[in-house]
Each structure stands twice: as structure tokens, then as C-alpha cells.
């Protein structure tokens, strides 16, 4: 058995939380229950990883089994990677019958026609999600199993979730393989990325609580009324109700999808009175603003009720789930009056 494969399996085990190693290995299914019972799971992770590697060596684990363990690990812990959302388009509205075996054949053939040194592994899950693991090599080197790309594709949908490897030069080939295998016409990257794969799915599949104009739900209204200090005057009470209503209209009344950042790029021209001659060159002013939080949308939702921001928040902040993007480019609208200016 290849020592490189044994070491890869050992390192994969090291990434798993110690209390969950047993459960992950059981899902893997390569080692029997009798073999797993011989492992002392109370020892250090280093010791556990060596025990697992030894059993795998005795059982002649191959690259396919090592790749399967890696897929299972990434499926259980998808937040360890950064995922980007891609959208595919068809030329017509017809819906093709999806054949998993045909999909795998086309995908593999498309990539291997351009690059021989590549390993591709598939795993289908109950929610119609196909997980694809690609380890890339070069025309002269073997595939690097530590620099993999991952693709998650739900059949019969136009959305693809890709976590690219550091070898981004292979990304166009990967996208082309997805288009060919799934019988679409083209593919483009959406401006939506996050560590939380499930939240990205919630956004593009519209599975989150969407904003809508409404009065207070009865239960929420009663809770608010019960918690109001009777000494608070009507003006403050009305303001709290206004903030609550606007917040509900902006974010809905359910939990928000989990995103960890939103990025805004501003590009505008510096405007001044022409006679001041402030700028010799008419270069645009560029600015990058990035909001980061373990749960950005919930953090934004809590700003107005906490008195840290005015309600309603800017649409640039509240439109993230509806527009399915957390990367924005803000450019100024062309002025109808070229001579107008804004003083600095």
C-alpha cells in the first residue's frame, strides 16, 4: 500500500474533533466494527490517527477510500472551506431527465480530455446533492491530494457551489465540465460567498424567512406589550414599535442565513469647483468597506433595536439575501448636469 495514502488518511483523521472521530469512521464504513473496537479513542488524536492509519495499511486502503473519507469529512464540516455560488443557464426552458451515471461520465471525460493527471471522486447524498472532489496535477506531476477543489451540485437546479483549490488556474476547466455534464449552456459566478454552505443554499433556494410588509404577528405584539415599562411615555413606545415594524419589514421574523462578511467597493469621481483645480488628473476615488461578523445578518438585524443604528437600515445592508450577493460594486450615477459639483 502507498505510504502517501496512509499518511493522507492519518492527516484527515487529525482534522476531526476527537469526540467525533468514531462517528466519522463509522460513516466511512471502510473499517469494520471489530477493527474500530481495537482503537483506544481516549488517547490523544495523534495516537488515534496512528492507530487508524495502521488498520488502513493492514486492510490495504486505496486512494478511492482515502478520497471518500475526505468527502465525508468535508460534508460534515463544510464550514472549513470558502464556497462560491455559480449560476448556470440553458438556451431553452426544457428540463432534462438527470442521469447520475451519465453526469459522472461526461464530467470525468471533459476534465481528463484536457488533463490526465487528475483524480475525480463522486458521492451522492439523500437531498439530491452530488459532492465532487477533484485533486489536480499537472502534465508532469501527480495530483496533489492536499489541494483539492470541491463541487456541490443539486440536480435539476441551475446552482453550483464551488470551493476552489489554491490552483485556481483549473477553475475554467472545472466550470466547463459542469456545464457539459449537466446539459447547460453557460455558467457565471454570482457575487455570493461564505464559509456556511447551508446558508448559501438557503439564500439561492429561498429557504429563509423573507422580508415582507406586515403588522406585528399577534404573538410578537403581545410579548412586546408585556415587556414595555408602563412608565415609558407614548412617544418612546411608538418609536420602539416603529423600529420593530421596520426591522420586520427588512429582515422578516425568522432566523437569517449565516454569512460571515459583506464587501462593498465604491468608485466615484472627486467633484469640486473647476476653478479650484483640485485634481490634475481625473482619477476615480476608490474605497473598500468590509463588514465581518460570525453571523453578519443577525448582527445587522440587531443594530436598530439596540439603538446602534437608525431604522430602517440602508438597502445596501438589508438586500443581501434578496439579491443573493454579498459583494457589491457601487458606482455613481452620471450627472444630468455636468457642471454641478459637491464641495469637499
UniProtKB/Swiss-Prot annotation:
Coiled coil: none annotated. The keyword Transport does not apply. Keywords: Centromere, Chromosome, Nucleus. One of its GO terms (biological process) is CENP-A containing chromatin assembly. It comes from the Eukaryota. It holds the Pfam family CENP-N. It is found in: Nucleus; Chromosome, Centromere. GO terms for cellular component: chromosome, centromeric region; nucleoplasm. Its main location: nucleus. Probable component of a centromeric complex involved in assembly of kinetochore proteins, mitotic progression and chromosome segregation. Belongs to the CENP-N/CHL4 family. This is Centromere protein N. It comes from Gallus gallus (Chicken).
Amino acid at each position: 500500500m502507498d505510504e502517501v495514502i496512509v499518511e493522507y488518511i492519518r492527516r484527515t483523521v487529525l482534522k476531526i474533533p476527537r469526540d467525533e472521530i468514531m462517528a466519522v469512521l463509522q460513516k466511512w464504513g471502510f473499517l469494520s466494527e471489530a477493527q474500530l473496537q481495537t482503537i483506544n479513542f481516549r488517547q490523544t488524536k495523534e495516537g488515534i490517527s496512528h492507530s487508524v492509519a495502521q488498520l488502513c495499511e493492514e486492510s490495504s486502503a486505496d486512494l478511492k477510500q482515502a478520497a471518500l473519507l475526505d468527502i465525508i469529512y468535508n460534508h460534515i464540516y463544510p464550514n472549513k472551506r470558502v464556497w462560491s455560488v455559480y449560476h448556470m443557464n440553458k438556451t431553452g426552458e426544457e428540463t432534462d431527465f438527470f442521469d447520475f451515471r451519465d453526469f459522472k461520465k461526461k464530467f470525468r471525460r471533459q476534465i481528463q480530455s484536457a488533463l490526465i493527471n487528475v483524480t475525480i471522486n463522486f458521492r451522492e447524498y439523500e437531498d439530491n446533492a452530488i459532492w465532487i472532489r477533484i485533486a489536480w496535477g499537472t502534465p508532469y506531476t501527480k495530483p496533489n491530494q492536499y489541494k483539492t477543489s470541491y463541487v456541490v451540485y443539486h440536480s435539476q437546479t441551475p446552482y453550483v457551489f464551488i470551493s476552489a483549490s489554491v490552483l485556481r488556474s483549473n477553475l475554467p476547466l472545472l466550470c466547463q465540465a459542469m456545464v457539459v455534464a449537466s446539459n447547460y449552456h453557460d455558467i457565471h459566478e454570482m457575487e455570493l460567498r461564505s464559509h456556511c454552505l447551508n446558508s448559501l443554499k438557503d439564500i439561492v433556494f429561498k429557504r429563509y424567512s423573507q422580508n415582507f410588509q406586515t403588522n406585528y404577528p399577534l404573538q410578537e405584539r403581545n410579548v412586546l406589550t408585556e415587556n414595555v415599562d408602563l412608565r415609558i411615555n407614548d412617544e418612546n413606545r411608538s418609536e420602539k414599535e416603529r423600529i420593530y415594524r421596520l426591522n420586520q419589514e427588512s429582515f422578516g421574523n425568522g432566523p437569517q442565513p449565516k454569512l460571515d462578511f459583506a464587501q462593498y467597493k465604491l468608485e466615484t469621481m472627486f467633484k469640486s469647483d473647476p476653478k479650484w483645480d483640485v485634481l490634475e488628473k481625473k482619477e476615480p476615488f476608490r474605497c473598500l468597506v468590509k463588514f465581518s461578523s460570525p453571523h453578519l445578518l443577525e448582527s445587522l438585524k440587531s443594530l436598530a433595536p439596540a439603538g446602534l443604528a437608525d431604522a430602517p437600515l440602508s438597502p445596501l445592508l438589508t438586500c443581501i439575501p434578496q439579491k443573493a450577493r454579498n459583494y457589491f460594486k457601487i458606482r455613481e450615477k452620471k450627472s444630468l448636469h455636468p457642471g454641478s459639483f459637491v464641495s469637499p
